[in-house]
């Protein structure tokens, strides 16, 4: 299937910009930024790599490898940000606390941050970390879109049932401000829907000529 979303070309030319250990090392706070967050082993790096058609984000058999804010440029004004993964038991507590402080500082200060993509493993959705991110997004009036990753690990019927269940739980606890979809990196499931969300947040219009 040929995807025609206007964000597709930009994602395909994404390039690594820099890694930041703290907010004052981030790029200039201007333009459009979309951040990707998720508990360790939720498939965040794989999702980013699939969306950009590249191996930009580091994947590892050891969850929790992303320890920095990693910025990827789409053009002069637009960026994707890979946030630190959380929850892996082998990461020392002091390092976890360090990540948490700098994540909170980033989320609370970036004027250019236009939306947050939250990855949830469809087999283990709505973890404590996910609930914290949902609470923060609603309190901060930050648009959030959830990818239920690894949807290929379930049958389509089971995946759809989980989607509806999580959707209902989110609507009950947080209202209609959060959108959600199924996603699979290896099967390339849900790409068009995710691209549409990114294009909207980054204020891209479909410039395809009328037929």
Curated annotation (Swiss-Prot):
SUPFAM superfamilies: P-loop containing nucleoside triphosphate hydrolases. PROSITE patterns: G_ENGB. InterPro entries: G_ENGB_dom, GTP-bd, GTP-bd_ribosome_bio_YsxC, P-loop_NTPase. It comes from the Bacteria. GO terms for biological process: division septum assembly. Signal peptide: none annotated. Mg(2+) binds at residues 45, 66. One of its GO terms (cellular component) is cytosol. It holds the Pfam family MMR_HSR1. HAMAP family: GTPase_EngB. This is Probable GTP-binding protein EngB. It comes from Pseudomonas syringae pv. tomato (strain ATCC BAA-871 / DC3000). The lineage of its organism: Bacteria, Pseudomonadati, Pseudomonadota, Gammaproteobacteria, Pseudomonadales.
């Amino acid at each position: 299937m040929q995807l025609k979303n206007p964000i597709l070309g930009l994602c395909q030319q994404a390039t690594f910009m820099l890694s930041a250990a703290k907010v004052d090392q981030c790029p200039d706070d201007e333009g459009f930024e979309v951040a990707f967050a998720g508990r360790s082993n939720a498939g965040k790096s794989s999702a980013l790599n699939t969306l950009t058609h590249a191996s930009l984000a580091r994947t590892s058999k050891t969850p929790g490898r992303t320890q920095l804010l990693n910025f990827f440029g789409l053009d002069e004004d637009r960026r994707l940000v890979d946030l630190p993964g959380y929850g892996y038991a082998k990461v020392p507590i002091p390092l976890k606390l360090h990540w948490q402080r700098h994540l909170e500082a980033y989320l609370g200060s970036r004027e250019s941050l236009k939306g947050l993509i939250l990855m949830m493993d469809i087999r283990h959705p709505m973890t404590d970390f996910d609930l914290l991110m949902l609470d923060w997004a609603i309190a901060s009036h930050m648009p959030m879109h959830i990818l239920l990753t690894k949807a290929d690990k379930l049958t389509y019927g089971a995946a759809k049932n989980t989607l509806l269940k999580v959707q209902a739980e989110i609507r009950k606890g947080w209202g209609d401000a959060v959108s959600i979809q199924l996603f699979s990196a290896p099967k390339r499931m849900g790409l068009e829907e995710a691209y549409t969300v990114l294009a909207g947040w980054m204020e891209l219009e479909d410039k395809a000529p009328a037929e």
